[in-house]
Amino acid sequence: MSCRLVFSMLVVPIVSICLFAQGVQPYPNAITDRQFYAKTPMAPPPANTVFQDPDLGASMVRVTDGNTNPKEPNDFFLNPDSDVNEWSMDDSKFYVVAGGNGANLAFAFNPTTMTVSALPGAGVGGGLVIPLREGPTFSVLDPDLMYGTAQEAPLTISTYRFSTGKTVPLVDTTTCGTQPPLVKGPKQSSSDTTVSSDDNRIVISAGANSAGHRPFVIVYDQKLGCRWYNTQTGQIGGQWGPTGQVSIPDRYNVNHVKISGNGQYVRIGVARVGFYIWDVTSLNIEPCPVQDVGLRCSGYGAVGYDAYINGPEVLDELNAFLRPLGDLGDMTQLINPLPQPYYKGMEKSWAWTNGVLNGNVPVCGSTYSPVGNEEVKQPYDGEVFCIETDGVASTIWRFAHNRAVWNPKFYWSQPYGSISLDGRFFSFSSSWDLQLGTFWGDSPRSDVWIVKLD
């Protein structure tokens, strides 16, 4: 932890992160007790109206409504995967996903007033269509820049610059020398674009036509070139680093990938199995299977600068563990000692993209009922929260009720969240207690909401 602290204080330009590393509380106005706060019935406010959560007190704004995507009237909206940078590094821009056609829609944001507005070139509805495939990510260093894969060339890693409106290819991954060769075609695509804290390394999963079937993890270093790992054959190759067979016999398909802030590790998610950590400077792959009770690998998680956080449902729903990506068995319990009574019954998703800069900043998330119960019956039910990670204390900050109602038939009903790189704003999707209407028959709409974390 101390190494990450020294690194962050020397090079991270974001003021709030440095202040927390020096002992200043990041969220002085947030509730930190364990009292129960009932959820006050509340109609959904109009879009772009700032309001206060009536129970936990945070300022919020609704981003989208049924008119946000004119090409799909009454569309639903959700956050991108919490691994990507949904926010520009200066909080001036963010994007959401339009569920009907999968468009990435970017908006301007005023962090002082929490006003959402249209970017230059945006059409009716206010959302600027980002011409990249699903899951693009903002640069960690440049608020004008995004990384992703090209719409017409899904195996080409590209950049998009807002000021010019231009998409520029960085590398065609079919030229990376993968074995067997990646070949362009209608059944070959990619996803999961994430970047290291210096923007130098970019990772995607590639091959096949959907997540869960992809065989390749490709890391592109803007100075050294490509490096790849075929998860179905165990072969690693590329233009830098050692090549050969991986250190384990496991063979599998890739669900999702995420690169660490320091650029050394890639978390490779595998459906119903768990995940693997690849040290990209080596042939070393470390498995974290969900069936290994001792490793506590289950539950949603988040990758930071050089560490991983997850909540494996041990004793208490918020009982989270931090571990170095280079040693998954070296776990630190974030809430220690764990207070009683223990609370159970909530699932949770995590957001820690700001952790790619500094592993000491709080990890944030949202809780929701896995059976779609709209009621809140105990502390932390259906809330937006953050947990301290620096080891000094075990503070839990509480901000708002997210009013999401999970239904496994509709993936967008889960309150996936994303946090800004300075840790000041948390965005999430919610049906607002099923009050946003329906589309495509009886499918519940969801919109995107922003909470100010202070």
Model segments located where?
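Asp-box/WD-like beta-propeller blade repeats and closely related beta-sheet repeat scaffolds
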Residues: 121-210, 230-243
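Blade-level signature of beta-propeller repeat domains, shared across WD40, Kelch, NHL, RCC1
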Residues: 411-454
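Hydrophobic beta-strand positions that form the internal "hydrophobic ladder"
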Residues: 94-95, 145-146, 202, 266, ...
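Loop/turn-rich, solvent-exposed surfaces of beta-rich toroidal or solenoidal domains
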Residues: 315-323, 332-404
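Blade/loop signatures of beta-propeller domains
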Residues: 26-62, 66
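Blade-loop segments of beta-propeller domains
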Residues: 73-84, 90-149
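Structural motif
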Residues: 102-108, 153-161, 210-219, 271-279, ...
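Structural signature of eukaryotic scaffold interfaces centered on beta-propeller domains
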Residues: 77-90, 127-143, 185-198, 249-262, ...
